[in-house]
Design a protein with these regions (language model features):
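Solvent-exposed soluble domains appended to multi-pass membrane proteins
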Residues: 1-191
Length: 191
């Protein structure tokens, strides 16, 4: 959102006054006529997320905006991905153009307890992590399928990236740069 580099000892998001000094691309898009919204289906007060979101986006969707089955299946970090992506799709389908919506999915975060059948069996952390990644990937895939079927895909740029690397894969040493490689995928009909 604001190109703040990763710092090994300090989470910069906890210092809103520092973030305010940085450029924030959602504000630039707002000035260009875009509507902006942030989706964080968890506790928006965690880690000072609320201050970053409110100073950067016109609106937000948090776990407070979910009910029923989504909240009944809530986990440590908030609402699972399938519910967040369903809400995101519903909102995009009726959004005024142009828009920039950013969504933070959380089911791929520990403790890696995801709903549905286990696709990658195993009780150790690595297998639970891989199963959670499989679940999140399936939720993203369903979201993209809906966007393609409805035509939203045709004139939209989708950017997928991770918020951090992982220490949960056995063969990745957390002290090496490989542990911090994160994907950045640009896709969609707008390309």
């Amino acid at each position: 959102i604001s190109a703040v580099p990763s710092h090994p000892a300090v989470a910069m998001i906890k210092y809103p006054n520092k973030i305010m000094e940085r450029p924030r691309f959602p504000k630039d898009l707002e000035e260009a006529g875009y509507s902006t919204r942030y989706y964080y289906a968890g506790d928006i007060h965690f880690g000072s997320f609320r201050s970053l979101v409110t100073m950067s986006f016109q609106g937000m969707v948090t776990e407070d905006d979910f009910s029923g089955e989504a909240m009944a299946n809530r986990f440590k970090w908030g609402v699972h991905d399938q519910y967040m992506f369903e809400r995101l799709y519903e909102d995009i389908a009726k959004a005024r153009q142009p828009f920039m919506y950013m969504a933070f999915n959380m089911s791929s975060h520990e403790p890696f307890n995801v709903p549905g059948e286990v696709a990658i069996p195993g009780d150790d952390t690595e297998h639970k992590f891989l199963n959670a990644i499989h679940y999140s990937d399936a939720c993203i895939g369903e979201f993209i399928r809906k966007c393609k079927a409805s035509g939203i895909w045709d004139n939209t740029l989708f950017i997928l990236m991770a918020d951090h690397g992982t220490r949960h894969i056995r063969h990745v040493d957390p002290s090496t740069p490989a542990a911090y490689h994160i994907p950045l995928i640009l896709s969609g009909g707008a390309l």
